[in-house]
């Protein structure tokens, strides 16, 4: 997917707020959905500043969709005022949970973190470090471990990771245009094979 580069560039030098945020969503069908709901239920155990969202503010419960017509509450990377409401808080940390856990499967749930210079506290692709700098990512396995991790966070943790946050931000911007990458891949394939 393509991302909103202009919006992402607004985060290049933004001041950060010591906070962790999280978006649960409404779906509860597969492993990642179930984990998000269990995490949401743990909110009362979080001792640092935080903001838990059950769903995006622009999600229409009557029509079960967003204004952009997407029937999923998460939609495309950083699109819609609901998502911007989440990222404009400038939180240092965000709990990012993929729908499922597979080696090379990662989505806007972590890419949005990189594009906004937010440290992802992440459950998802085990080999995300093959694509992004793992030192700018905090991993967790279940909701109980997540609560422990969050409650030990300090603002200094963010600043200690700053170099890796910047690397992941640059990589996300470089990889932002999905269709351009496909075009470059096809061009390279044609050239290599003399087609």
Predicted regions: what they are:
Residues 143-159:
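C-terminal "capping" alpha-helix adjacent to the active site of nucleotide-linked donor transferases
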Residues 1-139, 157, 169-193:
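Nucleotide-sugar donor-binding catalytic core of glycosyltransferases
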Residues 161-168:
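C-terminal anion-handling pockets and recognition modules
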